[in-house]
Amino acid sequence: MSEWQIERLSRSHDRSAFSCGKPSLDEFIRRFVTQYEKRNLGRTFVAVRQGETLIGGYYTLASSSVSFEHLPEESARKLPKHPVPVVLIARLAVDASIQGQKLGEKLLIDALSRCLDLAEQLGVHAVEVDAIDDQARSFYLKYGFVSLRDDLRHLFLPVNTIRDALDSSRFQ
């Protein structure tokens, strides 16, 4: 079995058979991602095996901001009282046929690494996620995300925490 590669979504990727078990995530990659990309609302990256076009998983990144009032107290103490720039992991999904094989972790680490690169180019304080359900929330909590004050599934991970984790190979 060949190793997964993560690359920018293109027309050559086969999205038709993707099914993660969450209808909104399945429908996004099959029907809406092209318009999302054309309108510059986000960028989608897919996991494929070398030489294949079938998508095993994907994630989408977009720019966003988090309201100061929603920040965890520890973060809020250190920041000005206005919205904080973040990168949003808008979606992250793995095909049901390969769930439990660590592809979600590989996608998340790739997304966080990409977010760190973005933070070197422009002001980004953290990565934000709106977990689709409690199972997804538990997944993100394992990687150090913390809940924001507005919703337990609205999660946040500071760029400095990501940098430290990637530098120490804690995520690898």
What are the roles of these predicted feature ranges?
Residues 100-114:
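Conserved acetyl-CoA-binding loop-helix of GNAT-fold acetyltransferases
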Residues 40-66, 70:
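Conserved beta-hairpin
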Residues 90-100:
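A short, internal acetyl-CoA/4′-phosphopantetheine-binding micro-motif in the GNAT/acyltransferase core
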Residues 116, 122-123, 130-150:
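Conserved active-site alpha-helix within GNAT-family acetyltransferase domains
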Residues 52-57, 65, 82, 98, ...:
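Short Lys/Arg-rich amphipathic alpha-helical segments
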Residues 108, 133-136, 152-159:
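Short glycine/proline-centered loop/turn elements that form peptide/ligand docking sites
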Residues 1-22:
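Conserved N-terminal entry element of GNAT/NAT acetyltransferase domains
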